[in-house]
Amino acid sequence: MTKITLFPHNFRIQKQETTPLKEKSTEKNSLAKSILAVKNHFIKLNSKLSERFISHKNTESSATHFHRGSASEGRAVLTNKVVKNFMLQTLHDIDIRGSASKDPAYASQTREAILSAVYSKYKDQYCNLLISKGIDIAPFLKEIGEAAQNAGLPGATKNDVFTPSGAGANPFITPLITSAYSKYPHMFTSQHQKASFNIYAEKIIMTEVVPLFNECAMPTPQQFQQILENIANKYIQNAP
């Protein structure tokens, strides 16, 4: 076993200390380059999403107003229109229709996801309404399940009630809301604004996907919504 004596001017110890310093310096430079590369990558992604607003500065300016006679004088205050325009551009960047035209499987999955989201939304909404009126929801669930099955949605039957396998939230809303929140977080401070942006996101998505239903036997989201509403209204009107 080698015994190390800690003398102040021991050459061996000094040499062992300087070598790691060079390695550490090299590692530090390499890490800095990696961090810079990642940072530049995300800057490019963000620039791509906001490109429309940079190239159309005049349009954006017309959708803002300014505080005058205060500390914030001259600073643009964003309006809902600017945020909604950004969400619309984000939807165009996702390019649902373009992807669907190139990939039939993607188109089919998109149609099923959209109609399943419509089913989930209105099932919950009308179940709560029927329950509040003291109406048994079992027949309603059975009938809207049959409507979903007739619309061509895949799913499973349990206790004589069909449920679409993809029932859940609209999968395209989250990307729009997340992108808008990341760019304009101060526009999502109130529940009213959040709800307004969610409604708008759903509206433009439903409009965007309509052409995907033109070449198949499935009802459009709007038609399927009307089918569910008609079923619910029948139970409400026939309630004692």
From Swiss-Prot:
GO terms for biological process: actin cytoskeleton organization. Keywords: GTPase activation, Guanine-nucleotide releasing factor, Secreted, Virulence. Its main location: secreted. Activator for both CDC42 and RAC1 by directly engaging these Rho GTPases and acting as potent guanine nucleotide exchange factor (GEF). This activation results in actin cytoskeleton rearrangements and stimulates membrane ruffling, promoting bacterial entry into non-phagocytic cells. Belongs to the GEF (guanine exchange factor) SopE family. The keyword Secreted applies. This is Guanine nucleotide exchange factor SopE. It comes from Salmonella hadar. One of its GO terms (cellular component) is extracellular region. Pfam families: SecIII_SopE_N (PF05364), SopE_GEF (PF07487). GO terms for molecular function: GTPase activator activity; guanyl-nucleotide exchange factor activity. The keyword Secreted applies.
